[in-house]
Amino acid sequence: IRTPLDPDTTYSDDPLRMLRAIRFATKLSTPERPFRIVDESLASITRNLHRMQILSKERIAEELNKILVSSRPSIAFSLMDKTGMLEYVLPELAHLKGVETQEGRGHKENFSHTLMVLDNVCRLEEKAIAEGRLCNYDIVDNHEVITVRTEPNVWLRWAALLHDIGKPASKRYDPQIGWTFHSHEFIGGKMIYDSLKGDDDANVHLAD
């Protein structure tokens, strides 16, 4: 994947194109045939990350939603990490990176764990959809309406992506038992609620 014109000009004119390039690489990749962004374009993304400050949260969220309904969204978040974009788009996710060690005891690397969980959720959901085992439940005119679900649930995937973001704030080392992350789920829920103030739909699905 490359830009038709000079990448610095392309990305500076509309910085959302940087995130869109990552989305295209993710959506078009298969295990047998991965798509990649050419090195020149990747380097340009890193150089132009400061331009992302002009983007609205809504435009970024729209691209992230499209990434999350792909089969292997971990590709996108790995590319965001590689270019430095993750700190601009989802700093809470970037803070999961790394392993701290005390007395020779470390904890699991939570960033790679999160991406593995996300891809597994996507794989299992897509398998269940293909087999017709997922349904939508609605109330219409006081009647129950149940329909077979044919599309991915983006909120399920957001939950998988953000399920451990409370771990850095809750991390403690106990010489008796090792590393703990007590109440990380509640801390993470509050982080989501605080960052999504004003977006009632997202909070209903995620923070609650």
Model-derived segments and spans:
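Glycine- and charge-enriched loop/helix tracts that form the active or gating conduit
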Residues: 1-157, 161, 165-183, 187-206
